[in-house]
UniProtKB/Swiss-Prot annotation:
HAMAP family: TrmD. Its EC number is 2.1.1.228. GO terms for cellular component: cytosol. It comes from Arthrobacter sp. (strain FB24). Disulfide bonds: none annotated. Homodimer. This is tRNA (guanine-N(1)-)-methyltransferase. Specifically methylates guanosine-37 in various tRNAs. SUPFAM superfamilies: alpha/beta knot. Belongs to the RNA methyltransferase TrmD family. It is found in: Cytoplasm. S-adenosyl-L-methionine binds at G116, L140, G141, D142, Y143, V144, L145. Keywords: Cytoplasm, Methyltransferase, S-adenosyl-L-methionine, Transferase, tRNA processing. It is an enzyme of class 2 (transferase).
Length: 274
């Protein structure tokens, strides 16, 4: 896979030289290139922004430096020349980046990240880029950062770690949070007793079937407590009886293949009507 990142702060991307991402670059699994947007300016001040039309606060990133930078990146496209690279524009106005999207993007030949700053990039750049790229504005969440670089670090790691050969034990990718729409189960290591807290006995039993079932039920419990919104989207159509029972104990019923949370009955923590 080839990844290109365009930013006015290329040094911000230095962490991509470390850990598994850095090793993937060394091993030839990942070809990652960081480009300084200011290298594509033509004035002596190397300016990349100007005041917004229509007034308002802040500055807007100018179109021409971006067009020059993206044209250069597009000319160096990887893989099938007929297949457009994917241009990801980190933005709080983009679609939510998820583990499912990370898996989808891990199958692409080339990704390009455009790190905006200030009030954003001139919208005409996005319109122009659609002729040369598959444009995907994306957001890490419902909050605002100073620029796209932090989001690029997170997205790149989430995507690259899914490439074959990057993570040493591929099974760890299968069992982690969000891989199946649920949060990961709790994990423990030695010693088995620590400050009067014990490791759950089932994990010491050696019974792999019971351990797998316990872990699955813990996934349901943790997801219900921390991210109940994920259970609302969870495909429950083919769950075994033990899973349905565990979810029932948490207040969830399977209805038409989806999970529905039962309202608490009066006397169980919910006030009675009237």
């Amino acid at each position: 896979m080839r990844i290109d990142v365009v930013s006015i702060f290329p040094e911000y991307l230095a962490p991509l030289e470390l850990s598994l991402i850095g090793k993937a670059r060394q091993d030839g699994i990942l070809d990652l290139n960081v480009h300084d947007l200011r290298e594509f300016t033509t004035d002596k001040h190397r300016s990349v922004d100007d005041t917004p039309y229509g007034g308002g606060a802040g500055m807007v990133m100018k179109a021409e430096p971006w067009a020059q930078a993206l044209s250069t990146v597009a000319a160096a496209r990887a893989g099938d020349a007929a297949r457009k690279p994917v241009l990801i524009v980190p933005s709080p106005a983009g679609e939510r980046f998820t583990q499912a999207l990370a898996h989808e993007l891990a199958g692409e030949e080339q990704l390009v990240f455009a790190c905006g700053r200030y009030e954003g990039i001139d919208e005409r750049v996005i319109e122009w880029a659609e002729e040369h790229f598959t444009v995907r504005p994306m957001s890490l969440g419902d909050y605002v950062l100073n620029g796209g670089e932090v989001a690029v670090l997170a997205m790149t790691e989430a995507i690259v770690r899914l490439l074959p050969g990057v993570v040493g034990n591929p099974e760890s990718l299968v069992e982690e949070s969000h891989s199946d729409g649920l949060l990961e189960y709790p994990v423990y290591t030695k010693p088995s007793s620590w400050r009067d807290r014990e490791v759950p006995p089932v994990l010491l039993s050696g019974n792999h079937g019971k351990i797998a079932q316990w872990r699955r039920h813990q996934q349901y419990r943790r997801t219900a407590q921390r991210r109940p919104d994920l259970l609302a989207e969870f495909d429950a159509g083919n769950l075994p009886r033990a899973d349905r029972t565990a979810l029932g104990d948490l207040g969830y019923d399977v209805v038409d293949g989806h999970l529905r949370h039962r309202p608490e009955e009066p006397g169980n923590g919910a006030p009675a009507d009237g």
